[in-house]
Amino acid sequence: MTHSTPIRIATRKSPLALWQAYYVKDALQKAHPGLEVELVTMVTKGDVILDTPLAKVGGKGLFVKELEVAMLEGRADLAVHSMKDVPVDFPEGLGLVTICEREDPRDAFVSNTYHHVDELPQGAVVGTCSLRRQCQLKAYRPDLVIKELRGNVGTRLSKLDAGEYDAIILAAAGLKRLELEERIRSFIEPEQSLPAVGQGAVGIECRTNDERILKLLEPLNHADTADRVKCERAMNLTLEGGCQVPIGSYALLEGDEIWLRALVGEPDGSEIVRGEIRGPRAQAEQLGVQLANQLLDEGAREILTKLYQDHE
């Protein structure tokens, strides 16, 4: 079967973004032999503003806006995202249509000196740009000093190697995809640090009325991952979670059931509201909403209100 018009994938230029774009390109060409796929690379605001915490300059949506404009203007057909960077709302005419199989969703502890969080001496400096990681780390080890860490994976590792940090926390999936797994000293299990919503999964956004693209993307959707991520995202949407708030969540499938764990906390870890829920997989999104409301009733509402007021 021949496909005359090439598919254009909008992507950022960072090594991890390019890995994800090539991953989708390869999957499309494997599913549809003869299909031409081109990459349209672009720089986003999130790539340019590196001296300010994400939460203060508009959150993770900074990494996707330019890609979305390219699709709406017809310069690209689809965009590939790391699911943990995808905002809960989409511009009119665009939507998240495909979620690919999830990589390792855990956080990774990276250090040149220490093997584990428990080995860090009192007052050690740990780098992360995630309020979620900061919150859980400070709750576990209040003595640690958390220092802002921005830039792509290579930049962050360079800063560690330059001695600016005793350790840094990164997503395990990104290190594995960039073949940097040897830098991981230990994995941080969900029991100690719940991942970000959708962490480790790759999502594909496109125009919701583009029948050709929707059809081509169908074989790339991974139903198990999609149900888990939809459950986590439904919870996040109900909490109105953004980059400014420490929210962790992790959904697991157990047969026909889905098990969702989640938390909302103060950035300094002084207060964390946790909860979990189990129910039929077919009700994944309803369960996410249910758990979010439970967390809100148990104290998360006050935490979130305060945090959003602080950022106004």
Swiss-Prot record:
Name the pathway it acts in.
Answer: Porphyrin-containing compound metabolism; protoporphyrin-IX biosynthesis; coproporphyrinogen-III from 5-aminolevulinate: step 2/4
Q: Where is the chain membrane-spanning?
A: none
The Swiss-Prot or TrEMBL record annotates one GO molecular function as: hydroxymethylbilane synthase activity
Q: Which reaction does it catalyse?
A: 4 porphobilinogen + H2O = hydroxymethylbilane + 4 NH4(+)
The main enzyme category here is transferase
Instruction: Write down the required cofactor(s).
Output: dipyrromethane
An example GO CC term for this entry is:
cytoplasm
E.C. number(s) listed in UniProt: 2.5.1.61
For this chain's record, the cofactor binding note is:
Binds 1 dipyrromethane group covalently.
Q: Which domain of life is it from?
A: Bacteria
Q: What is its biological role?
A: Tetrapolymerization of the monopyrrole PBG into the hydroxymethylbilane pre-uroporphyrinogen in several discrete steps.
**Extra information:** The porphobilinogen subunits are added to the dipyrromethane group.
Q: Which family does it belong to?
A: Belongs to the HMBS family.
Protein name per UniProt? Porphobilinogen deaminase
Instruction: Please name the source species.
Output: Vibrio vulnificus (strain YJ016)
